[in-house]
C-alpha cells in the first residue's frame, strides 16, 4: 500500500522483491488454515501490484535494490520474530513449519530452515532482478500503445 501511495523507491523495491517472492511462494504452497478466496485474493493482489509498479514502468528499481530489499526483509523478519515470541504466534512461519507441505519442508528442522529460507529468498530476489535491467528515461520513450507507459510519462513530466 505504501509503495502505491507514495511511489517511494525503497517501498517499491521492498514490495517488488519481498512481496513478489513471499506471495509467490505462498501461492505455490497455500496454508490449509486460511479461507481460500481471501488467501488467493490477498496474495495475488501483492503480486499484481508489484508487477504493475515495476513492469508497468510506474516506478523504477535503483542500483543495489536487491541488497536494500534483502536487508529490509531481514530487519522486518527480526521484528516479526520478536512479535511471534512475545505473543506466542507463528507469523511467517518463523517459529515452526506449516502443517502443509511447502518449500520449508525441504530445508531441514527448525531453526536451520530459517537459514535455508534466507538463502532461497536471496536467490529469488536475484532472479526477480534479471528482467528489470537499466531503464530508458521517460522523456526518451516514444508514445506507447500501453497505457501504463503513458501514465508514467505523464507523471514524470509533472
Task: Give residue ranges: language-model regions.
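Alpha-helical transmembrane segments in multipass membrane proteins, preferentially the mid-helix core
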Residues: 45-63
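Aromatic-anchored segments of alpha-helical transmembrane domains
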Residues: 19-29, 73-83
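Membrane-interface capping segments at transmembrane-helix boundaries
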Residues: 59-61, 127-145
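Membrane-interface loop-to-helix entry segments
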Residues: 36-48, 115, 119
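Membrane-interface helix caps and helix-loop-helix hairpins in membrane proteins
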Residues: 6-10, 29-38
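Cytoplasmic-side transmembrane-helix entry/capping segments in multi-pass membrane proteins
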Residues: 12-20, 39-41
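Membrane-interface transmembrane-helix boundary segments in multi-pass integral membrane proteins
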Residues: 66-75, 87-125
Amino acid at each position: 500500500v505504501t509503495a502505491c501511495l507514495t511511489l517511494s523507491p525503497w517501498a517499491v523495491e521492498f514490495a517488488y522483491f519481498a512481496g513478489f517472492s513471499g506471495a509467490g511462494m505462498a501461492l505455490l504452497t497455500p496454508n490449509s488454515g486460511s479461507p481460500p478466496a481471501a488467501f488467493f485474493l490477498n496474495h495475488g493482489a501483492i503480486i499484481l501490484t508489484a508487477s504493475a509498479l515495476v513492469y508497468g514502468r510506474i516506478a523504477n528499481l535503483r542500483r543495489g535494490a536487491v541488497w536494500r530489499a534483502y536487508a529490509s526483509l531481514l530487519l522486518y523478519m527480526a521484528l516479526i520474530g520478536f512479535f511471534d515470541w512475545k505473543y506466542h504466534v507463528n507469523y511467517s512461519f518463523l517459529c515452526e513449519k506449516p502443517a502443509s507441505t511447502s518449500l520449508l519442508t525441504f530445508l531441514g528442522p527448525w531453526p536451520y530452515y530459517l537459514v535455508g529460507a534466507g538463502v532461497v529468498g536471496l536467490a529469488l530476489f536475484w532472479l526477480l532482478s534479471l528482467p528489470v535491467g537499466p531503464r530508458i528515461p521517460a522523456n526518451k520513450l516514444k508514445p506507447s500503445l500501453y497505457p501504463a507507459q503513458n501514465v508514467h510519462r505523464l507523471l514524470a513530466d509533472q
